[in-house]
Amino acid sequence: KFADKEENRQLVWNFLQPYLSDEREFFVRFGTVMLLSHFVDEEHIDSVLRLMEGVRHEGYYAKMVVAWTLSVCYVKFPEKTEKILRNGSLDNFTQNKTIQKIRESYRVSKEDKQRLNLLKRK
């Protein structure tokens, strides 16, 4: 795949950045799905989490893809991702959907699911 070849990764990363702040919901969704598919790794996790905190689109599909991405980040990097859920930077919908998606995962322990459930907002 083009995006996964080492010589293309920085090019793809740079290409995706404007999509994350676009006014068009499905452009935001595209950029976020690409990050999820190609950049949730040790090298990029801090940047991906920071970018997810910065997505500020009000559309349902944009918010859902951020929640989906954060749930996958949690499975792979639980401590780093939980900090995002604890720091209050997400809107209520995205926070709660992220927790819901994490709790639906078979790759997360029962104890983690119970602890994260306490972070849900009203």
Identify the meaning behind each predicted range.
Residues 1-122:
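Alpha-helical scaffold domains
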